[in-house]
């Protein structure tokens, strides 16, 4: 398959993730959209690594996946805290955590 197809797919996935972050108000959906954007970046890194014939992009994608795993743990803990205090996972309720 042509590497340009992977880059187009990556751009499409990143665009879908960006629209999800900007449009949705549910924290879980926003969180999933951010993960989709990270996976699009990983696909781009692996594609450019394949084009250049080096492993640099694949190593970087691995580190992005490790950081994303830590982000999942912390992000879900924050979302769970918001849900327990407000009984809603809305992004609009985040500024109310201080009360």
From Swiss-Prot:
The keyword Translocase applies. It holds the Pfam family Oxidored_q2. GO terms for cellular component: NADH dehydrogenase complex; plasma membrane. Its EC number is 7.1.1.-. GO terms for biological process: ATP synthesis coupled electron transport. Gene3D superfamilies: 1.10.287.3510. One of its GO terms (molecular function) is NADH:ubiquinone reductase (non-electrogenic) activity. It is a multi-pass membrane protein. It is found in: Cell membrane. Keywords: Cell membrane, Membrane, NAD, Quinone, Translocase, Transmembrane, Transmembrane helix, Transport. The keyword Iron-sulfur does not apply. It catalyses: a quinone + NADH + 5 H(+)(in) = a quinol + NAD(+) + 4 H(+)(out). The chain crosses the membrane at residues 3-23, 28-48, 59-79. NDH-1 is composed of 14 different subunits. Subunits NuoA, H, J, K, L, M, N constitute the membrane sector of the complex. Belongs to the complex I subunit 4L family. PANTHER family: NADH DEHYDROGENASE SUBUNIT 4L-RELATED (PTHR11434:SF21), NADH-UBIQUINONE OXIDOREDUCTASE SUBUNIT ND4L (PTHR11434). HAMAP family: NDH1_NuoK. NDH-1 shuttles electrons from NADH, via FMN and iron-sulfur (Fe-S) centers, to quinones in the respiratory chain. The immediate electron acceptor for the enzyme in this species is believed to be a menaquinone. Couples the redox reaction to proton translocation (for every two electrons transferred, four hydrogen ions are translocated across the cytoplasmic membrane), and thus conserves the redox energy in a proton gradient. This is NADH-quinone oxidoreductase subunit K.
